[in-house]
Amino acid sequence: MNWSNTPSFLEKQRQRLERYQFQIKVSEQGRVVSVGDGIIWIKGLPGAAIDEILISEDECCIAMVFHLTEELVGAVMLVQTKKLKAGTPIFPLKRVLSIPVGDKLLGRVIDPLGHPLDGGEIPPHEEQGLLDRLSPPILHRDFVNRPLYTGNKMLDNLIPIGKGQRELLIGDNGLGKSALALDIVMNQKDKKVYCVYVLIGQKRSTVSSTIQLLKEANALDYTTVVVAQATALPGLLYLAPFAGCAIAEHWMKKGLDALVIYDDLSAHANSYRELSLLLRRPPGREAFPADIFYLHSRLLERSTCLSPALGGGSMTALPIIETKEGEMATYIPTNLISITDGQIFFDESLFSSGFLPAIDITKSVSRVGGKAQHPQIKKESGRMKLDYLQFLDLELFTRFGAKLDAKMQKQIQKGRVLREILKQERFSPLPIEFQLAWLIAYNEGFFDELNLEDIPKMLKKIEEEIKQSTLSLGSPREQWKKAIKEWLMA
């Protein structure tokens, strides 16, 4: 063996020393000044950044940087602990919050940090999604051009929603906003739409009943539930919608369709106001901080329809907001109305009169959903919303004893028939084929001679026949007309 070209041991060490570069590892350490109400004030940490994660020495405390001053760092607690006190060392992790994402979260109930609340295993961490990230730029977006079927007669026909749209559900407490949202989730079964239901500031009983309803409808198979209860730390209430958005965003970027429901953003706005006041930020209108509009806009702008070049995925957002005595002109509702692509308004007087869902057509609008509506549905619904609004005006005159001619009386009768048709029980989503069937039946006058009490029976008959029929949205109208006539005559 030739050893002449083999470097000696000393030569190897010399080469290693030449390559060696001395690096000083610098780590920051701060100390707790005060702690209380879910807020930590920390001295030190000159390199701290907004949204950065902080931990204590024994890792019993996890917090997030939320406010910076010249002397102190304000952080929000994300884990409840009694071990934290003044003088406790705090260390930055030099990274921002992320959450596990992916198909393995389907059927799970988690908190905004990704911890399981259903007694199951900890979700795998192979795929992570940032809680807060920039929304897709304009060039990465596409027009809303595909319908999201809700299973609701009023929405699918008069206030249609498209995939990638942001539609606000607004109204007083207890009028059925959450029930409608659950209806929409239940209707996505077998439609390849992944759902995320975010419960923000809800009571434990409400959380339990919501999860139970999803289980009974077999909707948990394609749904992830993110929960921040009313008793949770304000920091978790603040993070909950961002966690749900990150989970849904993962499916959108994979070219799939996702639906995320924020129930509700009133509690989210209140938690943000609480944190801001505790951190001594200057209050603005209704004591909310000045950037509350930016907070909700950067959350909702992440919901969109991506261009085909990026997979064509979509994320539809249905934020829920609560009003007081039907007042829409308050700060947070007006903010969200201006951010979203339309709103569905729930009216207390309609609810009291037994008209369910208590959706006020006069104040509800879908600005982009009409472009995504199926041509057959769009053609049949046509002027229906306008005709219904005219009927409401005419009916108002009859209450004052005004005399109407035969044409107007016929229009009022037809409007009352339509109002009876649009009534729908909770948690009973209907297939889109049924929607087309009743539209054709209504336009052909098949309901005109019926008593209002008989209309639900006829609708039930159509619903039963639809389940056994081979007709689809693409079938010729004459086939639909002939089949419906036979069903109603039988």
UniProtKB/Swiss-Prot annotation:
EC number: 7.1.2.2
InterPro entries recorded: ATP_synth_asu-like_sf, ATP_synth_asu_C, ATP_synth_asu_C_sf, ATP_synth_F1_a_nt-bd_dom, ATP_synth_F1_asu, ATPase_a/bsu_AS, ATPase_F1/V1/A1_a/bsu_N_sf, ATPase_F1/V1/A1_a/bsu_nucl-bd
Topology with respect to the bilayer: Peripheral membrane protein
SUPFAM superfamilies, per database record: C-terminal domain of alpha and beta subunits of F1 ATP synthase (SSF47917), N-terminal domain of alpha and beta subunits of F1 ATP synthase (SSF50615), P-loop containing nucleoside triphosphate hydrolases (SSF52540)
Top class in the EC scheme: translocase
Superkingdom in the source lineage: Bacteria
GO molecular function ontology, one term from the record: ATP binding
Keyword terms of this UniProt record: ATP synthesis, ATP-binding, Cell inner membrane, Cell membrane, CF(1), Hydrogen ion transport, Ion transport, Membrane, Nucleotide-binding, Translocase, Transport
Compartments, record wording: Cell inner membrane
Function: Produces ATP from ADP in the presence of a proton gradient across the membrane. The alpha chain is a regulatory subunit.
Record note on quaternary structure: F-type ATPases have 2 components, CF(1) - the catalytic core - and CF(0) - the membrane proton channel. CF(1) has five subunits: alpha(3), beta(3), gamma(1), delta(1), epsilon(1). CF(0) has three main subunits: a(1), b(2) and c(9-12). The alpha and beta chains form an alternating ring which encloses part of the gamma chain. CF(1) is attached to CF(0) by a central stalk formed by the gamma and epsilon chains, while a peripheral stalk is formed by the delta and b chains.
UniProt family annotation: Belongs to the ATPase alpha/beta chains family.
Protein name, entry field: ATP synthase subunit alpha 1
UniProt gene name: atpA1
